[in-house]
Design a protein with these regions (language model features):
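Internal mixed-charge
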Residues: 2
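Outer-membrane beta-barrel pore domains
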Residues: 8, 13-23, 29-168
């Protein structure tokens, strides 16, 4: 197993390049001759009110015994607004691809799918209490990934949640 990271941190910008992998693990469960994953995380402060972030990764898994390989990847872009000391908003766009069934996100037919998601989160602070409402829309490349209330298949879904955090 090999883990590695190269980074650069400046006052208004940071970037991290990460690697995790192993080779020669033919008797592991699940069986894999090699697994390689590389990721990039970066953030930049554009002003006192705005910042941007990126997080992306790709993973390749090779199985010599079964003579197959899998691959998946994902990317997320974050746009942050700090409106005041007590309130902020984050818009996150994510896309992940599982065309070679690497993370086992498949539709009802067993085919790998790609998903785009957009999330908007608020962050409201009062003393030690933080309220975080979030709304998310997901859209998949297959209409067989999500299930409607009536049991029918659909390619999109939405979620609303509220988190409450108290810090000691």
């Amino acid at each position: 197993t090999l883990l590695a990271q190269v980074s650069h941190v400046a006052s208004k910008f940071s970037v991290y390049l990460n690697y995790a992998g192993y080779f020669g693990a033919k008797n592991s469960m699940p069986t894999a001759s090699s697994l390689n994953q590389i990721g990039l995380t970066a953030s930049a402060t554009l002003s006192d009110k705005f910042s941007i972030g990126y997080d992306g990764t790709v993973q390749l898994l090779k199985n010599e015994i079964l003579e197959e390989s899998t691959k998946w990847w994902g990317s997320a872009l974050y746009l942050n607004l700090t409106a005041s000391d007590n309130f902020g908003l984050t818009l996150r766009g994510e896309y992940f691809g599982d065309e070679k069934y690497g993370i086992k996100v498949s539709d009802a037919n067993g085919d790998g799918v790609n998903v785009f998601a957009a999330t908007i989160s608020g962050n409201y602070k009062v003393g030690n209490f933080t309220l975080i409402p979030e709304f998310r829309l997901d859209n998949a490349s297959s209409n067989l990934l999500y299930t409607k209330k009536d049991g029918g298949a659909t390619k999109s879904t939405s979620t609303f949640l509220v988190a409450a955090v108290f810090s000691f």
